Amino acid sequence: GPDKGDLQSVKYDNDFGAWIMPFIMAAINTRVVRRSHALNDYVYGKDFRYDEAMSSGQGITGRIKGYAGLVALGALMLGKPDSLYRKLLSKVLPSPGEGPSAEERESGYFNFTVIGKFKNGKLITAKVTGDRDPGYGSTSKMLGESAACLALDGKKGTQKSGVLTPSTAMGDALLNRLEENAGLSFTILS
């Protein structure tokens, strides 16, 4: 579809009534969604667009938090592997292998809202939740269920070969596994 580039700044989002900022995973997630759409013969139409952002909140506080987050994200992205800047960053950031404690992983969670807009102005809203830390607990469960799905559930996706995405390789079989075994929920709100 006629997608624009990923969000590069802070802006106000009328649909959410809040300030939004770039989301670090958007650079990967958006490409996976768009490739899935293309592999499925543009099932949502050639005008389908997809992007992601992270809410930084409402009002002036949300705007300030958005710009602070943007600066922090930019600072992380600037650290080339062998640069002095990266060496300085490594003094304050977690080392490889470090991360949240077991208690933090177990008590972590995520939730996000997805808004779909149709040409006629109709909106559809969905909520996705996970019962563990998204960077560790939920991701490991998603990977495990993906492996089990590929090994045990046969060809459930819409595509059989090539460079596939999770949805085109595993389809609803993966969605069902994530809901049944990985602590995720996918709910249409309106």
Locate predicted features.
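C-terminal catalytic/substrate-binding lobe primarily of soluble NAD(P)-dependent oxidoreductases
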Residues: 1-190
